[in-house]
């Protein structure tokens, strides 16, 4: 509930001349008019003073119904409408007051205020001039003169704005319109004109703001909803575009342009929603196909091409297809060098390709634009660890497999290399020592990469067989010498090797 007196202070600031109604005595009582009407008026006045606007409005509705020719009832109802922010509803009541009582200057002055805000300058000027001719109070006279000067200034500015617009000087037109709309805040046509200027100047979001205001100020404004929808569409915001075009069709279901646009946006929206659902389910190949369809469905709006490629880049990265990911992500970054999502996804692809310097560079670039992103921070730390690790022993390189190799590929590579570098194959002492070292590295690589837990540690930049990288120290529990690997069967999934190789 609004505190008593708050409505009075609000009206005093915004509609000072309406406060006169609180002191107006109901003249109809002296003429023997319906006592019920008087009761509604008095109760409504008390409720209005207490800030109970809805209840006050009900009382004034009843008073108008009881006495349709009572100007006080209309005036007080107009006051409530204005206090509720319903200027459209207040205007007819003020007009009725003036029709019933021509010399009621407070009502005419207030109507002039409303007409000025609506941009109806000729009508506003007419009201202010009539106030000055009707023997007004000193305060009313001063206010009418001030508003008349303001209305005249708005006429001049509007003429300049229209001339600038016709001359394609949209920057100047916007400057003039800015000044007018500070006063004529409810002028839908001027907001639509400024929106056109913003569109010409390449500022669609400012245009949308004006058009949204115009859609509320003018009833059944299908044109505004259509333009808002198309602007959102051009910006790549298909969901808001769909929402706005639906508002147009609610007003006119047969609107040809809105219906045609609706079908296009709905089709595109369905494809994108389907693609995102596939990504959530980890079905990256299918999602890629959907986004390729998006680009075919809307080839003329660059935003959808960029966004689609950005998501395809993400799919390739998550699906561990680094070559494709790097190619598509790079295309996105050529169009949008600061695209954080593309930078992150390309960095992940670089990690798979063991291009650590490039990954670090991408993560650092992404961090410049989003320094609080935990994923970027963790990715950068991982890339730095892997770079450091690559300068030491790299188990993937030892086995000659990619970082995203499956366990089966790892075992196959291990068996091949274990046979190739088994020390029994070498008779020369120097070659045998070299083979022993190679064989130990090959066996160590197999041990780490075939164990999910150990492999994860290594992938995160920590060598589980390196004592220096093990927290807590205390030596390397996985250290092996050649002797400990003798008798090891590279073709066994575990257990001791039961025989030695013999070569002719």
From Swiss-Prot:
Example of a GO cellular component annotation carried by this entry: endoplasmic reticulum lumen
Cystine bridges: 248-258, 313-329
Segments passing through the bilayer: none
Residues with the Phosphoserine modification: 274
Subcellular localization: Endoplasmic reticulum
One MF term in the entry's GO annotations: protein kinase binding
Tissue: Widely expressed, with high level in the liver.
Result after altering residue 75 to H: Reduces binding affinity for misfolded proteins by 40%
PROSITE patterns for the chain: DNAJ_2, TPR, TPR_REGION
Taxonomy, superkingdom: Eukaryota
Keyword Chloroplast: no
Ranges for region Flexible linker: 375-393
Induction conditions: Up-regulated during an endoplasmic reticulum stress.
Oligomeric form and interacting partners: Interacts with EIF2AK4/GCN2; this interaction occurs under endoplasmic reticulum (ER) stress, hypothermic and amino acid starving stress conditions and inhibits EIF2AK4/GCN2 kinase activity. Interacts with EIF2AK3. Interacts with EIF2AK2. Forms a trimeric complex with DNAJB1 and HSPA8. Interacts with THAP12.
Protein name listed in UniProt: DnaJ homolog subfamily C member 3
Organism (species): Mus musculus
Lineage: Eukaryota, Metazoa, Chordata, Craniata, Vertebrata
